């Protein structure tokens, strides 16, 4: 039996892609048709390079997304303003290092609006473009197996915080209902779905630092319940989950043990 090679999803973008993404992010004028052409060409190139490198299960590199989680604000209603920013607990333990990171500007500043209204889909038009670009590139370069990323309800709630729903649980439920169609659309397109769930580990030392590990695990369980609701009816073999403790440069001395968050 051979092992298949794959990766987590997000891959480096070329400068033209970056310029378009941040023009859109900042609300600047840009040519939508040129944007779409740029994304199509960039996805083709990123798939070519994956195939050349021997990757068996390829992705679009999340090329058209400003971020693996906050892209949701552009495709769903209810988000405006700005969410509170909170540095991970391990970086707060080393304030000089945190200050140096901030001054280096190594992490781009993405908009992180709060949920201030009902979360509903604006339609799957942008997702359909992503799917079409990936499948066209796969056909061109002979890749037979592909996957596409989508944010989990929990990670959305981590970065786009709740200012509308009466409880955190109600917000998670609304996000799960809203994301169901996105998940289903990816699977029905013949791609595997990767649900990005850093909330199941990263949020322990980012948002829930006031809780004990045991209390956090209960929060994580509620996130899993919301995710399972959103995935209901999809074949298990077509879904994979990405959990991480954050890919930022830091000491990571506050990461919760894997044994506590994985069954």
Give the label of every model feature segment:
Residues 1-263:
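Domain-level signal for soluble alpha/beta catalytic cores
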